[in-house]
Amino acid sequence: MSNRLYTTRRQSIVDALVTKFKDINGTGDFLSNVYGNVSPRLKFWDEVEDFPAIHLNAGSETRDYQGGGYKDRFLSVTIRIYVREEDAVDALDKLLEDVESVVEDNSRLQYTDRQGNVQYTQQITILSIDTDEGVLEPLGVGEILLEVRY
């Protein structure tokens, strides 16, 4: 079998992001504490039992073929964030800020592929941030769309 340089690394990247988001613990510069409620699978708000919670999902993946057999891979990742607070808008804004900070601090994210090799993303870009704007209060739902280049 040949060395698989260009295999998909979807789940490995999502798992590495989950590990980083679990560091949001209300200490230091963090404004929120997720108490480890971070999952590599999306849930809808009516399925979430523990708040606050962060759920991730790997979406579509594309390739950009370069010269010399090199290709860039682009993975879309959806991050859905749930809070239940008296002031859900404020709690959601704080947690969104924490998630954004983790993404920005880890744009060159280290992860391990299926063969056990340490890899790095080239760049993680936030494409959009959206919220329910308080419509579901005391629940709050936010969504961040990422593009991961690896």
Where are these regions (language model features)?
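Glycine-rich, aromatic-bearing surface loops/beta-hairpins
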Residues: 126-145
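A broad, low-specificity signal marking well-ordered, structured residues that form hydrophobic/aromatic
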Residues: 52-55, 77, 124, 144
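A structural detector for beta-sheet-dominated domains
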Residues: 45, 57-59, 127-132, 149
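Oligomerization/assembly interface segments of phage tail-like spikes and tubes
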Residues: 70-86, 139-150
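Extracellular/virion structural assembly segments
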Residues: 67-74, 83-106
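Residues forming well-ordered secondary-structure scaffolds
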Residues: 12, 16, 94, 98, ...
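Small/polar-rich, solvent-exposed N-terminal microdomains that initiate assembly or binding
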Residues: 1-67, 106-122, 136
